[in-house]
């Protein structure tokens, strides 16, 4: 009876570990290839606009500090 309980506990812990690691991997892949990360990359292309001056960039940095 003790070995069955230990085996059941071991399987539950193993199941929890695999589901947590799968969620971590999917979350990491979602951050890399997800819609939100692509949108954030699109906003960065405006920093290379030649019409922006150094003062404009400094103002943008101040605005985006707490965003």
Curated annotation (Swiss-Prot):
Residues 1-23 form the signal peptide. The keyword Transmembrane applies. GO terms for cellular component: extracellular region; membrane; other organism cell membrane. The modification Phenylalanine amide is found at residue 33. It is found in: Secreted; Target cell membrane. GO terms for biological process: defense response to bacterium. The keyword Secreted applies. Residues 37-67 form a propeptide. Its main location: secreted. Expressed by the venom gland. Keywords: Amidation, Antibiotic, Antimicrobial, Cleavage on pair of basic residues, Membrane, Secreted, Signal, Target cell membrane, Target membrane, Transmembrane. Amphipathic peptide that has antibacterial activities. Belongs to the non-disulfide-bridged peptide (NDBP) superfamily. Short antimicrobial peptide (group 4) family. This is Amphipathic peptide Tx348. It comes from Buthus israelis.
């Amino acid at each position: 009876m003790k070995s069955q309980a230990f085996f059941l506990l071991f399987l539950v812990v193993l199941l929890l570990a695999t589901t947590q690691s799968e969620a971590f991997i999917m979350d990491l892949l979602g951050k890399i290839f997800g819609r939100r990360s692509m949108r954030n990359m699109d906003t960065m292309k405006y920093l290379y606009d030649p019409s922006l001056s150094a003062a404009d960039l400094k103002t943008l940095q101040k605005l985006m500090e707490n965003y």
